[in-house]
Design a protein with these regions (language model features):
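Conserved beta-strand position repeated once per blade in WD40 beta-propeller domains
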Residues: 21-23, 96-98
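Beta-rich carbohydrate-recognition and catalytic domains
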Residues: 1-17, 26-92, 101-201
């Protein structure tokens, strides 16, 4: 058994030093690995999901962003300590599983965006905003992002689930519900994913 290091962080150059929860799959004759990458620690902003690919498991491509750091509107938030959250709060990524290979051959990546009012509050406490998906194409580029599930139990729906760019202008991002994709096979793959409760935890 051999162990290969995929990434080495360096705090002195401002790199993201919290790299956690690797998820590995094989797709189209390459390995695909995703993980949570954060500036400093778990449940802290900014953080994002990144991914990399490898032909042999030894040499890996430079990581790319799979699900970016964003802000989310907190008007719908019904969880504790709402007073600690600004109206546009950091949306903290979380997953137990990232990749789903659908029966039609599509590789779907997924993550959940929640909130951490303080460093002790996990974003998967039931009061997050939504689960997002996007397709990983056979050339390892990505589709647009879509919402696959609003967290209605946490107070979020199609009207109040709004994501924003964190860069300066806080521009509202267009992330539609998955059924509005023009790719019908992608929609079928998402429908199938919604039946797999373990992946959606």
């Amino acid at each position: 058994v051999y162990t290969y290091q995929i990434r080495r962080s360096c705090r002195t150059d401002g790199d993201y030093t919290y790299n956690h929860a690797p998820m590995l799959t094989a797709f189209n004759n390459r390995l695909v690995l995703s993980y949570i990458s954060g500036k400093r620690d778990e449940h802290g902003a900014p953080d994002e999901i990144v991914y990399t690919t490898s032909k042999d498991g030894c040499v890996w491509d430079k990581e790319k962003v799979l699900f970016p750091y964003m802000l989310a509107d907190t008007d719908g938030y019904t969880g504790p300590d709402k007073e600690l959250l600004p109206k546009k709060a950091p949306a903290i990524v979380h997953f137990r599983m990232c990749f789903y290979k659908a029966s039609n051959g599509k590789l779907i990546a997924t993550t959940f965006y929640g909130f951490s009012p303080d460093s002790h509050r996990a974003p998967n406490n039931g009061y997050g905003a939504a689960r997002l998906v996007r397709e990983v194409y056979k050339d390892y580029t990505l589709s647009d992002m879509y919402i696959i599930k609003y967290n209605e139990a946490g107070g979020f729906n199609g009207d109040n689930t709004i994501f924003y760019s964190p860069e300066g202008s806080n521009e509202q991002l267009d992330i539609p519900y998955y059924v509005h994709s023009s790719d019908k096979e992608f929609v079928k793959a998402c429908d199938e994913l919604l039946t797999k409760k373990l992946i959606l935890e």
